[in-house]
């Protein structure tokens, strides 16, 4: 991140966001690809295995998404909306004007973080290998930590293209492990839409699949987060099973 902020502060690159992305994303990815080309023929590819593991570990999101919601869950269970708003902004950078919106935003945060830190990375790793997984992670970091609006916009455009296919496949998994009819109604209108963001689609599909009721304070609201987490766990098992079958067929 220091390198990102250093490049953004550069007077020569301040108005050249594409060049910043080339340096931050394309250059490391090309170096990784070259390293794998060199290592793959050696010792039957065993020397490349540690590189795969390191890249995958780096590409996967850090931290426990559900554990990060612990203070919010405690405050919401008590019905303390002020404390819930405080810890949500402090811990996960989520805020809202009302309590109902706050819970909805936290639900969306849970779904999005699980998708972008796990499902999308695993998808691109299995499809195109560590080069694609690293590309996705570096773009995500540029979007999350970039200070230059033009740079963030370009990174978002590229990430939107990366997200288009896996987010729809995950929504389909939601339908298989959750309320199929409800998810189908959501996907019917948004399946081929380029305009809807991955975060919006995963939020709509996840809440529909888990049959999330209107926001409520107290234990009922916390139960909605548990329902979404259980949906994500079931989807992860199906995600792995799908890739396992894919690997066997190949």
Residue map of PLM features:
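Hydrophobic N-terminal alpha-helices or hydrophobic patches in metabolic proteins across all domains
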Residues: 1-250
């Amino acid at each position: 991140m220091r390198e990102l902020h250093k490049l953004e502060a550069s007077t020569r690159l301040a108005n050249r966001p594409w060049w910043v992305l080339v340096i931050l994303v394309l250059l490391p990815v090309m170096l990784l690809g070259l390293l794998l080309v060199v290592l793959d023929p050696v010792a039957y590819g065993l020397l490349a295995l540690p590189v795969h593991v390191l890249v995958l570990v780096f590409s996967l999101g850090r931290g426990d998404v559900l554990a990060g919601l612990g203070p919010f869950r405690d405050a919401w269970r008590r019905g303390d909306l002020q404390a819930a708003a405080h810890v949500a902004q402090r811990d996960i950078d989520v805020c809202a004007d009302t309590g109902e919106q706050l819970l909805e935003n936290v639900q969306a945060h849970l779904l999005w973080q699980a998708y972008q830190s796990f499902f999308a990375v695993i998808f691109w790793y299995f499809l195109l290998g560590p080069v694609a997984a690293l590309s996705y992670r570096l773009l995500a970091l540029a979007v999350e930590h970039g200070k230059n609006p033009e740079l963030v916009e370009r990174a978002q455009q590229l990430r939107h293209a990366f997200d288009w296919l896996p987010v729809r496949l995950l929504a389909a998994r939601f339908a298989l492990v959750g309320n199929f009819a409800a998810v189908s109604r959501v996907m019917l209108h948004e399946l081929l839409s380029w305009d809807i963001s991955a975060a919006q689609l995963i939020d709509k599909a996840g809440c529909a699949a888990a049959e999330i009721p209107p926001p409520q304070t107290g234990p009922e609201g916390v139960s909605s987060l548990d329902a979404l987490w259980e949906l994500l766990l079931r989807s992860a098992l199906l995600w792995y099973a799908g890739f396992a079958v894919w690997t066997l067929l190949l």
